[in-house]
Swiss-Prot record:
PANTHER family: NAD-DEPENDENT PROTEIN DEACYLASE (PTHR11085:SF4), NAD-DEPENDENT PROTEIN DEACYLASE SIRTUIN-5, MITOCHONDRIAL-RELATED (PTHR11085). Its EC number is 2.3.1.286. The active site is at 123 (proton acceptor). This is NAD-dependent protein deacetylase. The keyword Protein biosynthesis does not apply. It is found in: Cytoplasm. Residues 1-244 form the Deacetylase sirtuin-type domain. Nicotinamide binds at residues 35, 107-108. Transmembrane segments: none annotated. Belongs to the sirtuin family. Class U subfamily. NAD(+) binds at residues 24, 28, 35-36, 105, 107-108, 123, 193-194, 217, 235.
Length: 244
């Protein structure tokens, strides 16, 4: 393991345009579980068990807003979570001028809380919420303190989290920014993701000019064979050792 850590240190030292692509594994170390590991919910009224994927779909939000928000508040918002060693190390790399962008599948805002500035949030953020009718902004606290379905204080419309639900497209501007950053990178570090969620996982295909592809994940991924360095360990532990 020490050999791999030293190799990663060497790669970082010789890189000037690093991009980090991260998934749920980055945030699990801050106590935020991957929502896909959540149990499905049984709806007694309908006599149906919904999967986590169904519960955070656009059609479920439209048809059963109350049930959507019950699940959303219980399983997707973690207001007491703090950045871990991975978030802090990445913010330091940006401060050093090495890291140029973070592309994340997470919606918790922990990268920004750690100090990272150039973050492309592919799936949005729980910290931003907007009225579906008049587009008034509301913060995470408003959602958590709302009883039942959050309603706009100005017009009474439903306040929807600015997160990309299943059946919804990703934001074009975010995608363009992420592709631009990845395609220009000299080193791409992929961490805390098994690369199975599309279209997000497909973005790594835009990395074809760089010198170093690094994969840090507890389990193996489909991209391991293409990588110059694979470390099967905790992302926080690895990055914490690299940026000490």
């Amino acid at each position: 393991m020490d050999d791999k850590i030293n190799k990663l240190k060497e790669i970082i030292k010789n890189s000037n345009n690093i991009v980090f692509f991260g998934g749920a594994g980055v945030s699990t170390e801050s106590g935020i579980p991957d929502f896909r590991s959540a149990n499905g919910l049984f709806n007694e009224k309908l006599n149906i068990t919904f999967t986590p994927e169904q519960l955070v779909s656009h059609s479920f939000f439209e048809r059963y807003p109350e049930e959507f928000f019950n699940f959303y508040k219980a399983k997707l918002i973690y207001p007491n979570s703090k950045p871990n060693d991975a978030h802090i190390a990445l913010a330091k790399l940006e401060e050093m001028g090495k890291l140029k962008a973070i592309v994340t599948q997470n919606i918790d805002g922990l990268h920004q809380m750690a100090g990272s500035k150039n973050v492309f949030e592919l799936h949005g953020s729980v910290l931003r919420n907007y009225c579906v009718d008049c587009h008034t902004f509301y913060d995470e606290k408003f959602i958590l303190e709302s009883k039942g379905v959050p309603k706009c204080t100005k017009c009474g419309g439903i306040v929807k989290p600015d997160v990309v639900l299943y059946e919804e497209p990703l934001d074009d501007n975010v995608i363009r920014g992420a592709i631009d950053a990845i395609s220009k990178a000299d080193t791409l570090i992929i961490g805390g993701t098994s690369l199975v969620v599309y279209p997000a996982a497909g973005l790594i295909n835009y990395y074809f000019r760089g010198k170093n592809l690094v994969l840090i994940n507890k389990s193996s991924t489909q991209a391991d064979s293409k990588a110059d360095l694979v470390i099967n360990d905790s992302i926080g532990k690895v990055l914490g050792k690299v940026i000490d």
